[in-house]
Amino acid sequence: MRATKQLRRLWRREGGFGPTALGVIASPLAALFGTAVRTRNFLYNVGALPASSAALPVISIGNLAVGGTGKTPLSGWLIRQLIRRGWKPALVTGGYGEDEILLHRKWNPQVPVIVAQRRLDGARESLELGRDIVVVDDGFQHRRMKREVDIVLLSPAHRFPPRLLPRGPFREPLEALRRAQLVLVIAKGGCELESARALVAELRRMPGIPQVEIFSFQPGEWETLDG
């Protein structure tokens, strides 16, 4: 628990002996991790690692960093928009958080929620259930599955420039945004709007980055998941 606390302090770039000492250890590990991530992405980009089709349209909602950036509420909102337009969506998730699964089932009870660590298998299962489109929660790094749209979320709460795991919370460098179709900077309430606008402006100056917009939502009242 103490190590986790110090790691969070390192990610927030706080001073002190603990984060500084941990940073000395984490820096070479982050460099190795970055090399592995870039190599993997390169192999997918050139086709050396294959990507397979789910045989129906796939929209992936993902992020670059670990932790919450609003993927779950955005996925639920997107599913409702698809239903209104006549689609029959399914939601595929890795199932790492039980609360997220319960929320999806509460928000859209008529929509199948498929738990599959191999997102491609989950997408194919949705086809067997008569679905005609899939929304994948946390699918950006699952490159084995082809998708029509990649939406990537960023939080203004994360410090920039990004640092890769374990030195920082990022799973991929910013250059990975170039394979997305849309980048959304999430503003949770009015207090984050100013910092979200600043991050959007910074991202729009980067070459090769796709469309970048702000997605703002207001937290609602507490509600029990058992109704």
Where are these regions (language model features)?
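Beta-strand-loop-alpha "switch" segments that mediate conformational coupling across diverse proteins
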Residues: 212-221
